Amino acid sequence: MTDESLMQAISSGDKRAFDEVYERYAAALLRYFMRMLWRDREKSEDFVHDLFAKIVRKPEYFDTSRSFKTWVYSVANNMCKNEYKKQEVRKGMSNGLDNHYSLYDKNTNVMNEVQDNFFQEAFQKSLVDLDDKHREAFSLRHLEGLSIKEIAEVLEINEGTVKSRLFYATKYLAESLKEFNPVENR
C-alpha cells in the first residue's frame, strides 16, 4: 500500500494503517530530529511522538497534491524551525554538543574506533556550525536521501536555491574537515 493510500485509511480510522506509517517513518524521523535538534534524544523522541499525534488527530492536513514523504518532512522541518525560534539557537547550540561529547567512551582503546569518533564529532560540530538553512538542506539531501525537488518542496524554495545551499554546505564541510581522511585511517 502506498503512503498516500495509508493516509486515506488513517482518515477513516484504520489503526493498522497508522501502525504501518509509523513503522515506515518513525526511525528515519527520529534520526532527522536528532540531527536537527542538537542530538537531544529525549526532545527528538518527543517530536516524533508529537508529529505522529498530529497525523492521527488531523489526517486531513495531509496535502494530497504532494507525496507523503515530502509532506511529513515539511511538517518535521517546520517543527524544528519553531523549536529554533523558542531556543535562540545560536546561544544554545553548544549544549547539545557538550552532551554528545560527554557520552564519548573514554575507555575505548581501539585506534580505528577512536579516529572514527574524532571524525564523527568533528563532522557533527561542523554540521551544527552551519547556519540553519544550509544544515537543513544538507541533512535532507545527504542524511535523509531526499531529492533536490523534494527538498525544494519541503523548504518551500526553488531548486536552484537548494543546489546553492548544498554547494555552500558541502564546501564548508569539506574545508572544516580537510584534516581528516577516514579512508587512510582504517
Question: What is each PLM-predicted segment?
Answer:
Residues K149, G160:
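Residues within helix-turn-helix
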Residues S5, A9, R39, G92-S94, ...:
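C-terminal edge and immediately downstream basic/flexible tail or linker adjoining helix-turn-helix-like DNA-binding
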Residues E60-T64, S74-N95, Y168:
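Arg/Lys-rich amphipathic alpha helix in sigma70-family domain 2
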